[in-house]
């Protein structure tokens, strides 16, 4: 494979709120760059990027397919990211391997809640962004309102590269404030592939000059090098100098460059492509990736995006291709990967052999022999590698920092209809969990049912849909249930438990004394061994820890997992003959269970951040309804003539909300919801949940 000039590569993501036109924008990019010969519309379920059947039916993007295309002499690798909040893990996962992103906003709504979530995620990974204000042909679209929401809701500094020419159905092009010309799309033929570059319309000259002056001023304020040129003579700065300064500012996330258009009507996409090339980073513009030595996190290592550095790769997505089987999408951070190479999975300490390497165009593929640093591709043949794991050179191992995934908040029981379905279900679960680590699966100890947990109702719907459609599992599906947690509210300084069993022959004996201490939310679990003088032999300590953790999976109130606790093993005793790992595991488990009863246990429920946008006429109804659902109103603001109510509401109260809201507001209000945190259940609610959980026992 010919060596790629990395300065001519852009690894980008296109991110947005659901329905902002992200998939349509990606489709147009693929069309104008010559990769897609018939434009696919989300409206008719034919979009090239949306390649799973459910996506085509639902008109939303669920998996991030990676595709490679070219604009002039620059290679653009695009990761398509989902806009629905249930799939934020897909977004996190793709942002992890991107160098830059395009945030697409709806020209009518401006910055919406999911846009804010994704923006925060991009900031967390330090991904430079440019904005594209889409759908400016729609009734009610307002470029100025969108720019205002970028300032107010994202707390970003927008630098306008363009102004729209014409509004709503009269929208016909853009004023380019960098080059100071107009680009117009007049005919509907050729699907917008050609546009005219002409003088700025006379009635927009003053507005354009004022906007350009403001743009140059903002850039100068954030770039010292440009400031000197600008102060010397504002009229003498060249287009190249302006572009270079904007590029530096975007790469430093000092400000965000703003473009506009209407992808559906084929206007404004080519200048967006130019902006991607001009202002978003190449792999050489981003810092070297850091990691650590396997087995010793204190030894920090770095890899630069060079072909002659040792190989380091991050697996960021696993997908099942109906023809090829399991495909692993990877980003090569350093070194060169060849088909047939043996590599080390440093996360698991296992060797893997690379099969074929593909560059993907949505769901079409091109086989290649090798791929260098800074590139994204899909590989076959990996048996043990899952999302977030590192593959590397066996002689220079490194683990790149992994991704952290949120805990699921909603679960559903699945009962296969026959023994054959049980086997198919096991296979389906293994494959689907491998693809998306935010699905968690466990077996209910009492009922024997398989419980699947996920990030929201749509998330579980898609899981069950794929299980039936791709793996042909016939099953009865239970109602979605809330994933409660248990917590401890007071410390227990000392609790002693002795496990003793004598049934002829060697018996079982283990004595442990533990202390338990509740910790702050998000702390997780910590086990401290404070045993001295060999009172419990070293080899039995991990068994006590394992017993405690096993017991924590089933809390004493209602059998939900216990969170945020520190357990200290203080002392104990053993017997030369009768003690064993199993005896200490049982002792650890029972000691925690009994001590937890004395630690004032409480029930936690997932609280969702809910944002409702409603006409003022229905504001009272919406607030009253949220209050009746135990919602805590956080704030109310006015946006675009509507009222926006933000509240924290328990997930258990939100089932069926979409239908209720629609009927109470005649379909005029909309809402979005995402997980916020776990909060304590009021005792009246907790008593009911506990009684229900223990009722069948």
From Swiss-Prot:
Main location: cytoplasm
Domain of life (superkingdom): Bacteria
Pfam families: EF-G_D2, EFG_C, EFG_III, EFG_IV, GTP_EFTU
Signal sequence, renumbered to the chain: none
Cited InterPro entries: EF-G-like_DII, EFG_II, EFG_III, EFG_III/V, EFG_IV, EFG_V, EFG_V-like, G_TR_CS
UniProt KW Cell membrane keyword: no
Domain tr-type G span(s) in chain numbering: 7-284
MF terms in GO: GTP binding; GTPase activity; translation elongation factor activity
Keywords: Cytoplasm, Elongation factor, GTP-binding, Nucleotide-binding, Protein biosynthesis
Gene3D superfamilies: 3.30.230.10, 3.30.70.240, Elongation Factor G (Translational Gtpase), domain 3, P-loop containing nucleotide triphosphate hydrolases, Translation factors
Residues given in the record as GTP binding sites: 16-23, 80-84, 134-137
An annotated GO cellular component: cytoplasm
Any one Gene Ontology BP term: ribosome disassembly
Compartments where found: Cytoplasm
Keyword GTP-binding: yes
Family: Belongs to the TRAFAC class translation factor GTPase superfamily. Classic translation factor GTPase family. EF-G/EF-2 subfamily.
Function, as annotated: Catalyzes the GTP-dependent ribosomal translocation step during translation elongation. During this step, the ribosome changes from the pre-translocational (PRE) to the post-translocational (POST) state as the newly formed A-site-bound peptidyl-tRNA and P-site-bound deacylated tRNA move to the P and E sites, respectively. Catalyzes the coordinated movement of the two tRNA molecules, the mRNA and conformational changes in the ribosome.
Protein name: Elongation factor G
Lineage of the species this protein comes from: Bacteria, Bacillati, Actinomycetota, Actinomycetes, Propionibacteriales
Gene (UniProt): fusA
